[in-house]
Amino acid sequence: MRLLIVGGKLQGTEAAYLAAKAGWETVLVDRHDAPPAAGLADMHVIADITADEARARTLATSCDAVLPACEDETTLAWLAARVPQWGVPFLFDLDAYRVTASKLASRRMFATLDVPRPAAWPSGGLPAVVKPSTASGSEGVVVAHDETELEAARGELEAAGHDVVIEEYVPGPSLSIEVLAWGGRAVPLQVTGLEFDAAYDCKRVVAPVGEAAEGSPAAVGLDGACHWDAAVGAGVLEALDAAALRIALGLRLNGLMDVEVMVGGPEPKVLEVDARLPSQTPTAVYWSSGLNIVELLAETARVGVPPAVDRTARRAAVYQHVRASGGLLEVLGEHVMGSAGPLKLVPGFFGADEALTDYAPGRREWAATLIVAAATTSEARRRAGETVRNVAIHERLEPVPEVETVSADEGGPR
């Protein structure tokens, strides 16, 4: 199997990593000469794929499938209009993506489908989340605690040309789930838990997520951290499945999407949906359940129906990012990986099972995604923390304590 990946940042890194785990050859096309995914791909073509149709066709038809890993509307539309005509499976649903790329359009869809969601301002009261309709991840997100902060955040976004979404702030654990769908059938995959840095960017993904057997769910830290084995109450994961499936079918999705929710009580409230390959969570799913989402997506497109899957957790996994800079070592959101150089896959990196990193001995500034697995989430977290300490000692870096923030309701997988 040979996969053409268009885009070499966060989503491209995810695609290249999981394609390699499936034993596939990868060809990366990116306009830049040193994107993060370039270090993981078998071949890197530096090009704007839309600039030369003959060359693009040659690249696409030399591969068994094309997976867009970017969010440039022009590029996506160009590929969607051509790749299927060239007879190559196109692992992307442009119509569904266009709906989910707008948070305002998504909220209208949630209302039509009667999907639980945060209340719109002012019904939800304060604090409230103010965010741009079309930005990705944590970009532009503000938690406003009074009307002065709210109006300032709204004014700043409007001045930058954004349509603005203002909705209820929902405290509680943040969960994510991917769904494969095709031809009116949909299959939910493994649920993951998300934790955030001070800028509301996802710094850590944990799998699996469990329900409390009895009594109240585990308390949630200000950064979204909790005992993920008992993160939510009974019935919440089933309700999340139901909401995710309703959205996939409502979108008439032929492909992959991820759904992010906050759980502030007995039901999950859907924050946003993205009809494309996300970053971060698929690797955590792979390490916990063994499900390779890129491989499953290609199989879904090939046979025209999502395959049956066993999403039972085989082990726990923790996936987190660190940055070394100025003599400090910090656990931070995934933005530090988007600005990294070409990444290498390093097994056993300072005690982690694997790392994706642009680290080199003696280099003063670098970033890494650390991946650890264990029998339980508590043991996986312990190992992840031990890895960070090992890095700090070996590299003579000062570890920065993780800053707890208001439990964000944005900034999950990109």
Identify the residue ranges that each predicted region occupies.
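ATP-binding N-terminal substructure of ATP-dependent carboxylate-amine bond-forming enzymes
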Residues: 1-93, 363, 375-376, 382-403, ...
